[in-house]
Amino acid sequence: MSGQQSSPVYKIALGIEYDGSKYYGWQRQNEVRSVQEKLEKALSQVANEPINVFCAGRTDAGVHGTGQVVHFETTALRKDAAWTLGVNANLPGDIAVRWVKTVPDDFHARFSATARRYRYIIYNHRLRPAVLAKGVTHYYEPLDAERMHRAAQCLLGENDFTSFRAVQCQSRTPWRNVMHINVTRHGPYVVVDIKANAFVHHMVRNIVGSLLEVGAHNQPESWIAELLAARDRTLAAATAKAEGLYLVAVDYPDRFDLPKPPMGPLFLAD
């Protein structure tokens, strides 16, 4: 009918947690399991209409998230409990909604973000783990976390990360601004915590791969600075495994007032 008004459109942001070990990454792909596909299916069931989500960062196969942020638009008016408890009831057990927030029209999960934060968890023990095997990377040689931390500080600020960039990276520029990078030990766990405005493909895992060589005393502390200056991926160490990597937080301007739950992974003290 010509005089009929269109339904209002709501923009919703969600915080998402997932164990990426059984998925071929975040992004929806044909004939393989993806986190995006499972989330969109659950949201569509609750909204009773097709839902497409946009995420803050597309994680690779096997990589986890405790602080992923997505947004979507819908004409379905639902209570917050529907977008949390209701969606979780329709999700597989290894994906969960952590929070929901109605956001203004100019919010975008990817383009409004000012920084992303990752944590890489290394289980540094002579014997391999079992229960947490898909949530940590096992490294059996003793690691000097303080040495790794000192070596990593040269990565702070705006730099060309070509030496730590995957060959297939499609980003237009290798330049990124690292705001902090800390390496700490928590019992048998060594945690690499890194925050940047954005990351080139495999950047965290490539940095960790080289830091492991420093931590095991196979390379001097100065090696990381030398790699950074060389701008040559072939000189750096192998890419660290996906299992230990978590997207733990995404920063946005305060005006969006998004929730900030503990970053995790939740088996570690925050």
Curated annotation (Swiss-Prot):
Q: Which residues form a coiled coil?
A: none
Tell me the residue numbers annotated for binding substrate: Y118
Q: Which InterPro entries does the annotation name?
A: PsdUridine_synth_cat_dom_sf (IPR020103), PsdUridine_synth_TruA (IPR001406), PsdUridine_synth_TruA_a/b_dom (IPR020097), PsdUridine_synth_TruA_C (IPR020095), TruA/RsuA/RluB/E/F_N (IPR020094)
Please cite one Gene Ontology biological process associated with this protein.
tRNA pseudouridine synthesis
Enzyme Commission number? 5.4.99.12
What UniProt keywords apply to this chain's record, in alphabetical order?
Answer: Isomerase, tRNA processing
GO molecular function ontology, one term from the record: RNA binding
Q: Which CDD domains match?
A: PseudoU_synth_EcTruA
User: Per its UniProt record, what Pfam families does this chain match?
Assistant: PseudoU_synth_1
Catalytic reactions of this protein: uridine(38/39/40) in tRNA = pseudouridine(38/39/40) in tRNA
Active-site residues per Swiss-Prot or TrEMBL entry: D60
**What broad class of enzyme is this?**
isomerase
Q: Which SUPFAM superfamilies does this UniProt record tie to the protein?
A: Pseudouridine synthase
Note the superkingdom of the native organism.
Answer: Bacteria
What family is reported?
Belongs to the tRNA pseudouridine synthase TruA family.
Function, as annotated, reads: Formation of pseudouridine at positions 38, 39 and 40 in the anticodon stem and loop of transfer RNAs.
NCBIfam families xrefs = hisT_truA
User: What interactions and quaternary structure are annotated?
Assistant: Homodimer.
Question: What's the protein here called?
Answer: tRNA pseudouridine synthase A
Q: Which organism is this protein's natural source?
A: Salmonella paratyphi B (strain ATCC BAA-1250 / SPB7)
- The gene name reads truA
